[in-house]
A protein has these predicted regions:
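Acidic/histidine-enriched, glycine/proline-rich intrinsically disordered or flexible terminal extensions
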Residues: 141-172
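Short, surface-exposed coil-to-beta transition loops
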Residues: 72-74, 110-115
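Short beta-strand edge/turn micro-motifs at domain boundaries
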Residues: 87-89, 112-146
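Transmembrane beta-barrel outer-membrane domains
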Residues: 13, 69-70, 108-110
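A solvent-exposed, acidic/Ser-Thr-rich amphipathic alpha-helical stretch
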Residues: 31-98
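Short, low-complexity N-terminal intrinsically disordered segments enriched in polar/charged residues
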Residues: 1-24, 28, 32, 36
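Short, cysteine-centered beta-strand-loop-beta hairpins and adjacent loop/turn segments enriched
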Residues: 97-107, 138-139
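Short beta-strand segments enriched in hydrophobic/aromatic residues
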Residues: 26, 38, 94-96, 132-135
């Protein structure tokens, strides 16, 4: 493997990690983490909101805190480079699940779409410089999830989620 291929492989890995941290920030309602994946002068264009990362992060935290649960998953991730070694473009497929209450009824909102991103490496660090969201389809229906009524299950949370308790990840 030549040096350029190796550098691009490392860059793709670092960019993919940004995408994962973005999803964790949404699901765990971790505003500082969500904001950290963007350059300060980045632009977020989601159609219904077009703004800077700080305002976008606050918007997400306010909107998602009203949900019972959120779960974002990454699908196909195509990261491409043009001539610059410090700029890359991504098409990141996602599925977003939101458990909400609509008119007193627990409701599942499922969205499938893609993030169209421009990433820039500045001072050796990759971050999102531009992100847009394309929604390909969505589905809304009443929730049917009796499995999660079992109190013995580990439940995902917000900032009290087990992922933030790494010091307790040992066998008793």
């Amino acid at each position: 493997m030549n040096d350029k291929k190796l550098e691009r492989h490392i860059a793709k890995s670092e960019i993919y990690e940004l995408v994962c941290m973005y999803m964790r920030g949404l699901d765990r309602l971790d505003g500082p983490l969500l904001k950290s994946v963007f350059h300060e002068d980045a632009y977020c264009d989601y159609g219904f909101v077009k703004t800077d990362p700080d305002t976008f992060s606050k918007f997400c935290m306010d909107a998602l805190k009203e949900h019972i649960a959120n779960h974002h998953m990454i699908g196909n991730s195509l990261i491409e480079f043009d001539d610059s070694e410090d700029m890359a473009f991504g098409e990141i497929y996602f599925n977003a699940y939101h458990k909400t209450i609509v008119e007193g009824v627990n409701t599942d909102v499922i969205i499938a779409g893609r993030y169209l991103d421009r990433y820039e490496r500045r001072n050796g660090i990759w971050k999102i410089a531009y992100r847009s969201e394309v929604n390909d389809w969505s589905k809304t229906e009443p929730t049917n999830d009796p499995y999660f009524d079992d109190s013995d299950c580990h439940r995902g949370g917000r900032q009290d989620d087990p992922v933030y308790k790494r010091n307790k990840m040992y066998r008793p």
